[in-house]
Amino acid sequence: MKIRVGILGATGYTGLELLRMLKNHPQVKITYLSSNNFSGQSMKDIYPFAEIDILLSKIDVKEIKANCDVVFTALPAGISYDIVKSLRDENLKIIDLGADLRFDDPSLYEKWYGRTLQDYGLIKRVYGLPELYRSEIKESRFIGNPGCYPTSILLATAPILKRKLLVNGEIIVDSKSGVSGAGKKEELAYSFCEIDGSLKPYSVINHKHVPEIQEQMKKIYHSEVTVIFAPHLVPMVRGILSTIYLKTRLSADELYGLYSEFYRDEYFVHVLKPAIYPSTKWSYGSNHVFISMKKDERTDTAVLISVLDNLVKGASGQAIQNMNILFSLREDTGLTFTVYP
């Protein structure tokens, strides 16, 4: 019996990415697709490359209950939570790719996203970063899929934080992301003429992913961590490269040894040998993350570099990895593809 899957928000970039990967997943049958903008039309007519002749509909909780074992919600922040609440008592698993289920402390969501999450404590949700919370994910029904920047930053810093090897509790992050991270916004800033041939910082210091990153770092480190974050938009479709600066007394060899051991058994996380630096092209279209490091012995500063595909490990691929865990499948099921060049 295949897993019956629904995708809410199927025509956005993360929804389409879910569709691209799930249609080739050997244990999945796609049974429900929703889209407010294209309700009543066939997915195949809107996006012929999808090769799925399913009628798109507006979100219908009764239809979801009747036709799905797991639902991916690829919706704007603030919309998913009401759906999760309405399905809370059903024998259904929900993986939210938005921000609504990411926070342990709902007051952070309220402060940064401007909405109160009523009865949040009744939703037994788990932060869906498998490399750190695998056992918790397996026992849950509600998964808050991490943001793209948090995934790239947390995986790159977790070994140091977990071992309490950070000095001074401060981390500086410079991240560069492809334009698909902004979704399908019809704004001048994301138009071809504005993006092409240009590099632009945005939401410096006050990006909405900062509280998510800091909350998770505190959970891993068992102490407050301050993140100074400067994201940049680069003229490419997909991919994130994060360069992270932090103080640690580990030597270069100790740093490499720590990371190699920490991620030794992880299929999707690759620790590169010294002096090898990753390219976003390596992770393009795949669920793989590449991490490299360099130690500045003069200043006791470690420079960590991570790359991933913001639409895959930063969103839809990680969501499928979480689904595989929930249903006791191999984590790489349906996720073994890569694209190069």
Swiss-Prot record:
Q: State the GO CC annotations.
A: cytoplasm
- Give GO terms for biological process: L-arginine biosynthetic process
From the UniProt record, give the pathway where this protein acts: Amino-acid biosynthesis; L-arginine biosynthesis; N(2)-acetyl-L-ornithine from L-glutamate: step 3/4
EC number(s) from the headed UniProt entry: 1.2.1.38
Q: Which PANTHER family match?
A: N-ACETYL-GAMMA-GLUTAMYL-PHOSPHATE REDUCTASE, CHLOROPLASTIC-RELATED (PTHR32338:SF10), N-ACETYL-GAMMA-GLUTAMYL-PHOSPHATE REDUCTASE, CHLOROPLASTIC-RELATED-RELATED (PTHR32338)
User: Record's Pfam families?
Assistant: Semialdhyde_dh (PF01118), Semialdhyde_dhC_1 (PF22698)
Looking up InterPro entries in the UniProt record yields: AGPR_type-1, NAD(P)-bd_dom_sf, NAGSA_dehydrogenase, Semialdehyde_DH_NAD-bd
- Top EC category: oxidoreductase
Compartment(s) where it occurs, according to its Swiss-Prot or TrEMBL record: Cytoplasm
Q: What is its main location?
A: cytoplasm
Protein role: Catalyzes the NADPH-dependent reduction of N-acetyl-5-glutamyl phosphate to yield N-acetyl-L-glutamate 5-semialdehyde.
Name the protein family. Answer: Belongs to the NAGSA dehydrogenase family. Type 1 subfamily.
- Supply the alphabetized keyword list: Amino-acid biosynthesis, Arginine biosynthesis, Cytoplasm, NADP, Oxidoreductase
Q: In the record, what terms sit under GO molecular function?
A: N-acetyl-gamma-glutamyl-phosphate reductase activity; NAD binding; NADP+ binding
User: Lineage in the entry?
Assistant: Bacteria, Thermotogati, Thermotogota, Thermotogae, Thermotogales
Q: Which domain of life is it from?
A: Bacteria
Q: Which SMART domains match?
A: Semialdhyde_dh (SM00859)
Reaction(s) catalysed (UniProt annotation): N-acetyl-L-glutamate 5-semialdehyde + phosphate + NADP(+) = N-acetyl-L-glutamyl 5-phosphate + NADPH + H(+)
- Gene that encodes the chain: argC
Full protein name = N-acetyl-gamma-glutamyl-phosphate reductase
NCBIfam families (UniProt xref): argC (TIGR01850)
Task: Name the active site residues.
Answer: 148
